[in-house]
């Protein structure tokens, strides 16, 4: 796609860019026929080995779907990051995990009391476990401008293809969807914010 849009292609590149922009804008309205959604929002699966054993499924989605998801995410990225505040450092914060680890170490070293606890949670397979209706509800509340696209992508099961067969993707976001991490962060932000409020 980058080659098609190269300046060296002159007028052809401009025509491709205009057509691509129109197509992405159409997708952002959620205007995708129901018959096409399972395939368009589906993906090919590849499996990566985890360090501790097991495999991590990665969905390699349609290039145009990924492009649209990136465009949708960029439209609301600043809003999302400011909405999360300091509660969530996984999405939109380069080296956020490092910052969290350093902050936790500083906190533990500065505490002089026996009634203080540092509670660390690792949500096992959480990315793929959050119910889609919750993601859609949070997107409607926090980022209504991209809700039509998110609804089109996640309001019904999509197809994941592997080795000539397909399985139905019905829960969570696809690993490999550019909107997956922020949708996960959007969904878990309210309980994390509430927990912070109660613990202060």
Where are these regions (language model features)?
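Short, intrinsically disordered, charge-balanced linker/junction segments flanking boundaries
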Residues: 193-200
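Conserved pre-catalytic core of RNA-dependent polymerases
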Residues: 1-190
């Amino acid at each position: 796609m980058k080659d098609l849009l190269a300046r060296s292609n002159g007028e052809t590149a401009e025509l491709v860019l205009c057509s691509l922009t129109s197509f992405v804008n159409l997708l952002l309205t959620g205007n995708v026929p129901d018959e096409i959604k399972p395939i368009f929002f589906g993906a090919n699966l590849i499996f990566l080995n985890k360090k501790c054993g097991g495999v991590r499924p990665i969905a390699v989605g349609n290039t145009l779907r990924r492009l649209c998801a990136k465009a949708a995410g960029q439209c609301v990225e600043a809003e999302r990051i400011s909405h999360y505040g300091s509660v969530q450092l996984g999405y939109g914060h380069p080296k956020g995990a490092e910052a969290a680890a350093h902050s936790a170490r500083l906190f533990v070293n500065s505490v002089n009391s026996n009634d203080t606890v540092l509670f660390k949670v690792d949500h096992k397979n959480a990315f793929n476990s959050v119910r889609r209706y919750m993601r859609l509800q949070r997107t409607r509340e926090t980022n209504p401008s991209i809700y039509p696209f998110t609804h089109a992508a996640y309001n019904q099961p999509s197809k994941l293809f592997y080795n000539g067969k397909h399985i139905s993707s019905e829960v969570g976001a696809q690993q490999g969807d550019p909107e997956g991490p922020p949708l996960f962060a959007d969904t878990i932000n309210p309980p994390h914010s509430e927990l912070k409020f109660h613990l202060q």
